[in-house]
Amino acid sequence: MRYENKEDTMTDLNALMATMITGKITDENEQNYYIQKEGLIFRLPKTEGDFAIGDDVTGFAYTDKAGKQRLTLTEPTATRDAYGWGTVTDVRKDLGVFLDVNIPEKDIVVSVDVLPELKELWPKKGDKLYVKLDVDNKDRIWGELAYPETFVQMAGKAYDNMQNQNLHAIVYRNKLSGSFVYLPENNMLGFIHPNERFSEPRLGQELDVRVIGYREIDRTLNLSLKPRSYEMLDADSQLIMTYLAQQGGHMPFYDKSAPEAIKATFAISKGQFKKALGGLMKQGKIKQDETGTTLL
């Protein structure tokens, strides 16, 4: 018996691809069950379950990397009917990006045609894309990026008390006006203005963002990729932290110390010194009193 695709079949394989189907086991060998659905045969590896000839089995129908019709009991993260997240596994500049959507021995391609024109904004390995599956007239399965309206429909509204929170976001749209992101843990949308980033993030890139406000009209969050002002004092703050560590966690200098003593020890002005101390105190790294400054 032939169990592979038949050129002369009268059934519609296209309609079954990338969907959940129920078929009947009609044959088996040592490695696989063979499941019939509307005149088509799908292979189900025996490693996925214990069945017998005559059993009805429900699973996800697809063609594997070898081009063979297959059924899996593993639930994919995306189907033809439902969007889901996929993880980028590979990038081909001539074809697009490959996604893992939890289908055994199968990655899904998101075509170059729907990716950003600037290839430096393409997703990289490990990035996340929100897709549903589509099947072309050659029965090939592709990943279809979610439209912006899809994110608007599924996302909730921002709360009033989110100012200055650090959150996790994923870029779902790049425009000249800025980066549009989805916050999966919060089910909210956000926007990063070009002034609030050092470089443009990739489509699908995961980001650590900070809330700086929200739009009243639609309750989407305004976000920043830039650190708080006191977190940007890298050189001076690090200088003080290093000195404190070398002195066993305490130094006799604090914000009331003489400018000359500060300059002689740290080679920075008293203004720089006080600003760095203030930032470190806000971060909870030090405390000050009349005896000096102590590491926490």
What are these regions (language model features)?
Residues 2-296:
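Single-stranded RNA-binding regions, centering on S1/OB-family and related RNA-binding modules
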